[in-house]
C-alpha cells in the first residue's frame, strides 16, 4: 500500500473533521531543474512546488516552497530556476553555483494552497513570519508522500 501511494500522481488531498483539516501532499518525483525538463514535465496548472539545491557535501537543501496559479506551475518554475530572470541576489547566487532540483503537487483550490503553504512555512522557519492560512480551520495537519522518500516534515 505505501509503495502504491508513493507512485500516485502529484496532487493534494484533504479531509475535514471537527474544524480540523488533514492534508496529504503527494509530490512529483524530484527532478533536476533544467528549463527544457520543466517545459516537458511540469503541467501548466495551479499547485505548490519546492526548490532544492545540492551543496558541497552532497546534501540536498531546500531553497523555497511556493505556489502558482492556473497556468503557473510551469512558468513559475521556469522563472524561479533561471538565474537571468530571478531578481533576488541570494537566489541567483545559489542557482549559478549549485545543481538545483524541484518537485511539485497540483491543487486547484486557492484556499488549500494557502493552508499548505502556511503549514510548511511554519515548520520550515519557526519564529519567522509565515503566510496567512485560509482561516477556514481551527487546526491544520499535513502528511507528505514522496516517490523519492524525500519528506521534510
Give names to the regions the model predicted:
Residues 1-63, 67-153:
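Boundary/linker segments flanking structured domains
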